[in-house]
Amino acid sequence: MAFSGALTLTDLNDYLGPSQACIKPVQAADVPSQDHSDVSALAASASTHIAIDHDGAYYESSTPPSSSLSAADSRPRQRTKLETAQISLNDCLACSGCVTSAESVLITMQSQDEMRRAIAELNQSNANKLVVASISTQSLASLSAKYTFQHPQPSSSRSASTSTLPLRVLLHRISYFLKTVFGFDHVYDTTFARHIALKEHQREFFQRRENARKRAKLSNAPADDDDRLHPDQVDGPTLPMLASACPGWICYAEKTHGELLPYISTTKSPQQVAGVIAKRFLPERLGLLAPSAPDQPSIYHVTVMPCYDKKLEASRPDFYDDITGTKEVDCVLTTGELDKLMLDEAFDICTPVPGEQEAIQESIAELSLQQAFNTPNPDVGSASVSMMPRLPRLPQLLDQPGSSSGGYLFLLMRAVWLDWISVHWDSLPLSVREQGILPKLDVRVIRTTDFTEFVLRAPTQLVEPCNDDTSQSSILFRGAQCYGFRNLQNLVRKLQKQTGVRNTRGAAARLVDADGNAIGAAAARNRASSAKARARGRGGMMRRARAGAAAVVKSSPLNPDAEAVDVTQLQLSTAHEEDERGYDYVEVMACPSGCVNGGGQIRPPTQSDVDVTRSSTTVDNHATDPEGYTKGGWAADQAGDHDGLELMLNKTCSNKTSAVPDEADEEKEVRGWQGTSKEWVRRVEEAYWQDSSVAQTRVTVAAVNRAVDQGGANDSGSSTPTLVGSGANTPLSSSNAKSIRVEDHQRLLESLAVSNAERAQRTRVVKLGGDAMAYADVLAELVVNELCLLAAPAGDALALDSARDKLFRTQYRAVQDEAVNGLAVQW
């Protein structure tokens, strides 16, 4: 089985080959002796031997004391067969021992071989079975990038829409492969599960924000009020909130920074939400979990993910389904493993499959809600499922504005903006409401685009002051995208400074209770540290230095002193306001560039792949690049004929057109996992957004922003909402590497635009295909409510909320140092 460069360490001198010598041995209790006359003498004279038989079995044999040797010689020695230790990912302590000892042994429980074995076992049984697969869009994008490179489009058909293999086509072909070869019943992408996870993420964020506002009100209450509660007596977690969809980040936080666990979102990842749909919703709709069912069905759920750490996430004991008696996700395959599986079965994903066009047209056809909910599902191909289900058609490849790592930050930013709009809509001028309104958005790239801050500001000059607790500040939301382990270190320091918590290493677990709240004396210390941090005025000197420098640059030549003072005060006030605000939310991912560059993704082509592509590609009279593509395609954006290829092959090259600043050079050196590069990640990113309707829509933000800013100066500092994107295939120029991606910014601004037409469209008839996102909202609410009613049949509001939290929430626990360094292992 092949592993990515993210897990394979070849340059360590303490590397050990895979073996059964595990770091977590099986413990066995000693049997008490029946003869207590002289236990010490017997222990001193007796001995135990462990022998290996010819069949590889282990046997324990006991040698009697020397006083009874004559009697022992007359009878055969007693032997006891020892049980073989079974080690799986359930036994993972997150100690990093598998990296240098037994990587293959631990991963065997989550591999294509295990999937083959499990499906073969299901096929041999006579019980009802349901086999479901969930495929991530990042995996589809990686496959699209690979096979588009290996099978370039002819020059006559080259266009933006045909330059890559469409994700919808890939999804249908993979679905055909899994159903015909392995007998899968349903194959979905994870976008609908992600949609439910995002809705739950939004629900949790507003709960935390409400808790934060309650604590703020209690802090501002008069001190002589005897009935005043302490702010820390408000139940529930508060802000900032950190993303929890990345298992690598969760593993790192549990091992190293247990003090941050109360701030990590408890919402399940899209993979685990897909498991809830596969193990709860689908069987219930298919009638497999009905009381009249003859026996318990066998449900097997496989996911295809861009990350090896998703295997660890699926193996967590928290994700065990008590109803079905199985895990929410039984097996996780990486993108590379799925690709190898198709190659082993001689399946050509570039060849159309029977009924492809009809199936794709049917998937995008406009259907009313009644038709979409009551159409018999054609995906049921297993003979064991005999009933005609009324399974709603799940939407495919939902276009979620935001990043290619899930769009968590952008979703919350939009939700906060729409919440502000709903409160202040009637107070806005009629001309602004008709034309459209956008917030002020500050985007700041910190060193590289893998650490980007977003500050959402309300256009306060258009709204009369109100009495809510948010009117004191124009900042509605402050968040960040933090990708890569190097940026995680900076993020942790920022969060510790903002919250006042400390890294207590071994005592990390004692800071967090079962619900993720700080407890005991450690909680008191954290409160004191947080108060001191707020009193210090975090980052004052650094901010003032930068503000002063900016003021000198922006001084007016006619009156430099007055202008410099005005700009300095403005920027000082803005910096102080942002610093006091802190982060509301951070989208954290452990991989550089996010999930499209996960450790389980397909690696870039090697030199041999390039040579094969060159020799197999027919070249016409037009000029071609080194990859065999006609110039003007993907390679047209590169600095020279060979630069794109050299970047993709992870080799150094020189820019032939323009000098690159030092900051851009530093950005170019930032690579993903071993064997990949920024250029290849960019191609996967382009494949991910190729069908994005938001990215293909041009919005002239500058005109709208001027309407918002009339009557007042733009006080948003480094606000950049005047960028206009040119589609999903707009490249990130190497000469401007520290700027925000234009297409990312375009998608964000498009999702934030609100007008009367936008509000009127919300009352129209919802149809699948016509507006997949609106249909997904309705279906997501239906799925969540139905699952909650199944878990809490009484229908009580508190019981339904508790059932919802149990279905879509989880908890995290700090790992103490003793478990990490092996001292907790009992030999």
From Swiss-Prot:
Pfam families: Fe_hyd_lg_C (PF02906). Residues 61-73 have a biased composition (Low complexity). Keywords: 4Fe-4S, Iron, Iron-sulfur, Metal-binding. [4Fe-4S] cluster 2 binds at residues 246, 307, 591, 595. Signal peptide: none annotated. The keyword Cell cycle does not apply. Residues 57-77, 209-231, 599-637, 709-739 are annotated as: Disordered. [4Fe-4S] cluster 1 binds at residues 22, 92, 95, 98. Residues 604-621, 713-738 have a biased composition (Polar residues). GO terms for molecular function: 4 iron, 4 sulfur cluster binding; iron-sulfur cluster binding; metal ion binding. GO terms for biological process: iron-sulfur cluster assembly. GO terms for cellular component: cytosolic [4Fe-4S] assembly targeting complex. InterPro entries: Cytosolic_Fe-S_CAF, Fe_hydrogenase, Fe_hydrogenase_lsu_C. Gene3D superfamilies: 3.40.50.1780, Fe-only Hydrogenase (Larger Subunit), Chain L, domain 3. Component of the cytosolic Fe/S protein assembly machinery. Required for maturation of extramitochondrial Fe/S proteins. May play a role in the transfer of pre-assembled Fe/S clusters to target apoproteins. Belongs to the NARF family. This is Cytosolic Fe-S cluster assembly factor NAR1. The gene is NAR1.
